[in-house]
Amino acid sequence: MAKDPVRVLVTGAAGQIGYALVPMIARGVMLGPDQPVILHMLDIAPAAESLNGVKMELVDAAFPLLKGVVATTDVVEACTGVNIAVMVGGFPRKEGMERKDVMSKNVSIYKSQASALEKHAAANCKVLVVANPANTNALILKEFAPSIPERNISCLTRLDHNRALGQISERLNVQVSDVKNVIIWGNHSSTQYPDVNHATVNTPAGEKPVRQLVSDDAWLNGEFISTVQQRGAAIIKARKLSSALSAASAACDHIRDWVLGTPQGTFVSMGVYSDGSYNVPSGLIYSFPVTCANGEWKIVQGLSIDEFSRKKLDLTAEELTEEKNLAHSCLS
């Protein structure tokens, strides 16, 4: 029995991440090899011609799972009937710009997209915010789309999670698929805390803790953390462009695990609405370890938090509270 197509919105679709992401979605990377999709692509008017070029290429690629493409600069048309929304469009910080200026541009973008999604998206639409500042953009979207359940709004920290997996796999010279349960706590920014205290590696002798195998706490508590925190900047320095293919791949991982479930015994990192778990203030979109089943995420409970970690969790929560206040000041 063929499945009904799922409508997936990508905003900022003519941009770098969008260009990497739409073929992955059309190929079944996000929702599986037997799930047909209809792509909705939104971008701003100056990018309309470029967006049309992407649409032409999607047609030319003849993806068997791709059952239709909507390419538009109209936010209502873009949001109508969508089941999944990946919000890549935002206002990037340019040299010499104050944080408040960037924040106020993004607040107005996410405020208007929130109301379009609320009015026109399918019931139970799942929303993933990728554009920076991702946690705070997601929070604004949540506040201006009150009828979208908070459990359906998330932001991308899977890229940081995957970066952490990659660093451990390189350090230990093991397959990245054998490393699991790293955690990204907090903000998708340089205050995020990549935590390996609960991470394990699948070895011929069974699962072993990452800390035990690395046996270099100075590296794990120092260079490892800063490498993951600063990885985005390192890629911009090397490529002269921000990370796109890794961000697109992480967005697919995030949605796939959310919709289809995480493997037994594995948790992943998602920016979700805090309920006070781990003494993180509620009312923030904060990255937690989660498991997913039946299209719902659940924060993993009962993990021990040492003193070193506690400070890191609090520091990134403070930054998110500041960002939230800054965003609210842009609204008033």
Swiss-Prot record:
Superkingdom field: Eukaryota
Active-site feature positions: 188
One example GO MF annotation: L-malate dehydrogenase (NAD+) activity
Record's subcellular location: Cytoplasm
Binding site for NAD(+): 16-17, 43, 90, 113, 132
Residues that coordinate or bind oxaloacetate: 99, 132, 163, 188, 243
GO terms for biological process, alphabetical: malate metabolic process; tricarboxylic acid cycle
E.C. number: 1.1.1.37
SUPFAM superfamilies: LDH C-terminal domain-like, NAD(P)-binding Rossmann-fold domains
Predominant subcellular localization, coarse grouping: cytoplasm
InterPro entries recorded: L-lactate/malate_DH, Lactate/malate_DH_C, Lactate/malate_DH_N, Lactate_DH/Glyco_Ohase_4_C, Malate_DH_AS, Malate_DH_NAD-dep_euk, Malate_DH_type2, NAD(P)-bd_dom_sf
Cellular component terms per the entry's GO annotation: cytoplasm
Record field: catalytic activity: (S)-malate + NAD(+) = oxaloacetate + NADH + H(+)
Keyword Transcription applies: no
Keyword annotations: Cytoplasm, NAD, Oxidoreductase, Tricarboxylic acid cycle
Record's subunit section: Homodimer.
Family affiliation: Belongs to the LDH/MDH superfamily. MDH type 2 family.
Protein name: Malate dehydrogenase, cytoplasmic
The organism of origin for this protein: Medicago sativa
